[in-house]
Amino acid sequence: MSGLLLLGLLFFPLVEIIKSVKEPEMLTEIKRRYEIIRTSLPADARWERICSKCAIITGMDPSSGVVGSNVNKGYEIYICLDGEDIDSAMYVFLHELAHMTVSEYDHSTNFWNNFKDLRIVCQNIGVYSPVGTKKYCGKEVKD
């Protein structure tokens, strides 16, 4: 059997396997809402990085012990995917997006103010509903 034919026989089943693997629905929904956020944020210097940069968004298993993380100010954002609580997941996602609005890497007063304002804007555009106080991926989230 020629090498090319063998490669073809291996390649096509692999393509079918890849096509059958689906992204978790919650991650798909977060990405859909992210695109709405990027195209709907008002003109404001704080939101410039969010609107101009398209982050790679990856889901994490709840057993990782991490609720969310942001690599290099939005190059990659990791979000814990736990159940079907989309608003708690969005709270965590907006927290990670808020890190893109400040130059510092810690949770400064400026960060918290921007995070609060971002949640309000996202509530107004219909991609976020306040969560109150609850557990998500083993951590407390609190609006």
Feature map (PLM): residue ranges:
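Metalloprotease/metallohydrolase-associated module, dominated by Zn2+-dependent proteases
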Residues: 1-88, 104-143
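Active-site recognition of the HExxH zinc-binding catalytic motif
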Residues: 91-103
